[in-house]
Amino acid sequence: MARVLAQSLSVPGLVAGHKDSQHKGSGKSKRSVKTMCALRTSGLRMSGFSGLRTFNHLNTMMRPGLDFHSKVSKAVSSRRARAKRFIPRAMFERFTEKAIKVIMLAQEEARRLGHNFVGTEQILLGLIGEGTGIAAKVLKSMGINLKDARVEVEKIIGRGSGFVAVEIPFTPRAKRVLELSQEEARQLGHNYIGSEHLLLGLLREGEGVAARVLENLGADPTNIRTQVIRMVGESADSVTATVGSGSSNNKTPTLEEYGTNLTKLAEEGKLDPVVGRQPQIERVTQILGRRTKNNPCLIGEPGVGKTAIAEGLAQRIANGDVPETIEGKKVITLDMGLLVAGTKYRGEFEERLKKLMEEIKQSDDIILFIDEVHTLIGAGAAEGAIDAANILKPALARGELQCIGATTLDEYRKHIEKDPDLERRFQPVKVPEPTVDETIQILKGLRERYEIHHKLRYTDEALIAAAQLSYQYISDRFLPDKAIDLVDEAGSRVRLQHAQLPEEAKELDKEVRKIVKEKEEYVRNQDFEKAGELRDKEMDLKAQISALIEKGKEMSKAETETADEGPIVTEVDIQHIVSSWTGIPVDKVSADESDRLLKMEDTLHKRIIGQDEAVQAISRAIRRARVGLKNPNRPIASFIFSGPTGVGKSELAKALAAYYFGSEEAMIRLDMSEFMERHTVSKLIGSPPGYVGYTEGGQLTEAVRRRPYTVVLFDEIEKAHPDVFNMMLQILEDGRLTDSKGRTVDFKNTLLIMTSNVGSSVIEKGGRRIGFDLDYDEKDSSYNRIKSLVTEELKQYFRPEFLNRLDEMIVFRQLTKLEVKEIADIMLKEVFQRLKTKEIELQVTERFRDRVVDEGYNPSYGARPLRRAIMRLLEDSMAEKMLAREIKEGDSVIVDVDSDGKVIVLNGSSGTPESLPEALSI
């Protein structure tokens, strides 16, 4: 409203005696003028005071280099010869927004009635129509409404000609009312003119149409005046938001506009309790007591509780538990975003900040708290302007301004340490991350607040679990923040579970929505009879839903009485939230999962034939980790699989990822042949600063950060550059790795598998003694001999500090012919499955299977020749037949070998030779 009136008024005509004026233009008035000048809309004009039909005074208001009052006075002095009459000084500058709205509405009423003037009756209608001010409330309480008042006004003065001039003047009585309203404001000791003062001026004038309207409506002017003065007295605290210089009681209007009083919030009990942090609060108090440079700066990682220390200081001040140097002071947190917001013109930001500093200096009881203090640097800076930090520097050094800053270590280094002048004005106070025990105490201190918010209870075990599990599994955040978030989200989860509607109520609710849609459709079609029937049905269903909800509440209340206090957040709920955040199963092992873990070897052997030692080692490691017995500071396990090519080293890692972690994609696979050169090693942790790819992160570190619970396969480890092994030392020992950006990546929940072909030559030489033709004891002793030889060769290739950190070095056996036959069955099944998608049923004979095994068996190369044999003998033959259209969708195909050893592919209708056992026929 202020903006519209600012255009409609020719303000300088309302001002006189600029030498005597004590009132400077308010921010709101100036902003209104600027806005309206920019808009250039054709608003209402108001005349009646001398000199209103002159040049565009809004342009005068916009001239740079002058404050609001100077601009107004300049405009008045240029026309002093014509402005003979003495007019109330700076009147409209002191109108509140509600009073401005009243005048605007009065003009609208004049236009509505077709009158070329604004009289006392229009001001009365404006007072009633404004609706929210003291005047409107008093008139409403007297039974006066806008409709009746309009009728009375029209009875008394009738309607006008209909032609309304562009400029609507005030009648002499209306001008007298405005002058009397200013007088009433002065008598009440107010530095502003509100709607209540306009009403008092109207009553005091006592004559005119408005007085007759009030009389006709049965209102007693004396009674109205009494009510207005009473309400003004009651709301004395709430009228401080004024236009102009504001209420004399408010010494720090700028600070209140752009800051929040933490001490007041502490007195009202709105701040969370601060547990611990005594040394930091005492150090802050100590620094605040200094004569100069008394500005502590809290530095710590995000989430360790820097802001909580400022709140703790505010609580101590509120409780009087502080030394006399800061006793009775107010801690006010400054919103830098709000301070900068809206400063469109040069110098506005600096003006706000200087006002704020002046208020702090004059009050002498303000401690300013700036969260994210690094935002001072560059705030408000434009071409040729200076930023907030440079404006504040002199005051910070001389001790005129007590300021507590808070920022993170990175931001402090990046912004504040770069400016030594600013750095020396702040005294750093390090805020370390609390320990797990301290975090538990903090959670117990906050427990009551979260119980009230979520309407439930937390067990001690839940709080302890939140601290411990967040510390162990959430590595990229800091205590107590991550533990508090766990507690909060667990409370939200439990509350939502208990707040759900009963199933019957949900069904009824769906039906109600359907009925409402149908009812609206009938109403649109004006079929009100049907709509009425549906409305009755809707009401019945809603009553049923209410009854079901009430019944549920009664049942939960009964449960509450038996179980003390309703829903309870337990350790299980905290574990569930940790699992949902990280993907790491930390909840207790269920019966089904226990069975799965105990039978893990059998399941893996369905895919991995032979290699009992490796399968058992993997299974033991997973079981150990799942029940929580593994070392919490090391990876789940780290293995090196050594052996000849094609015996299942990589396949075992894939099988584990598919079985236990959900899919083969859950595995992070790094082919170490890609890291053969020295400069490629940096790809694991990310390029160093200044190199291409620095922002992308490392292939290994980024993958583990996104999926902390997984299998990491380093395939063909011996192909990597030796520098890779140096990098892996800290992963194997401490379960951590620092990437190129300095972030620590947690490997404590990963299973590390390295495959290697080192020692395959030794195995090949001794391989003839390891076979199915030997008895068990001979096989075992031969395996142990080969294992020791391979281990010796590994020691020659890898450095001892690398091998010493591995949990186990597992040597894979060469595959026997029987094992190759089992692998052939698995590979043939894969072909059957691929053909099944094309609706072709395939069977192979025993002779064909033996032929495949004979051609595919090679102890030195493992199972890979078998894959090539199947490709050549089966897949190639099938492909030719399918292209020749001899095999079509829906056919049943049998593959056999004739007496000459040639592969023959027969359609099922051509005759059935000896078929494969059922296991291999799909």
Swiss-Prot record:
Main location: plastid
InterPro entries from the UniProt entry: AAA+_ATPase (IPR003593), ATPase_AAA_core (IPR003959), Clp_ATPase_C (IPR019489), Clp_N_dom_sf (IPR036628), Clp_R_dom (IPR004176), ClpA/B (IPR001270), ClpA/B_CS1 (IPR018368), ClpA/B_CS2 (IPR028299)
Residues of the UVR domain: 509-544
Region: I, residue numbers: 255-502
Residues of the transit peptide: 1-72
MF terms in GO: ATP binding; ATP hydrolysis activity
Region annotation II: where it falls in the sequence: 569-760
Keywords from the named record: ATP-binding, Chaperone, Chloroplast, Nucleotide-binding, Plastid, Repeat, Transit peptide
Region (Repeat 1): 95-160
Repressor recorded as keyword: no
Residue span, Clp R domain: 92-234
Localization: Plastid, Chloroplast
GO term, biological process aspect, one: cellular response to heat
Transmembrane segments: none
Listed CDD domains: AAA, RecA-like_ClpB_Hsp104-like
Binding site for ATP: 300-307, 643-650
Stretches for region Repeat 2: 170-234
Gene Ontology cellular-component annotations: chloroplast
Family: Belongs to the ClpA/ClpB family. ClpC subfamily.
Free-text function comment from the UniProt entry: Molecular chaperone that may interact with a ClpP-like protease involved in degradation of denatured proteins in the chloroplast.
Name of the protein described by the UniProt record: Chaperone protein ClpC, chloroplastic
Lineage: Eukaryota, Viridiplantae, Streptophyta, Embryophyta, Tracheophyta
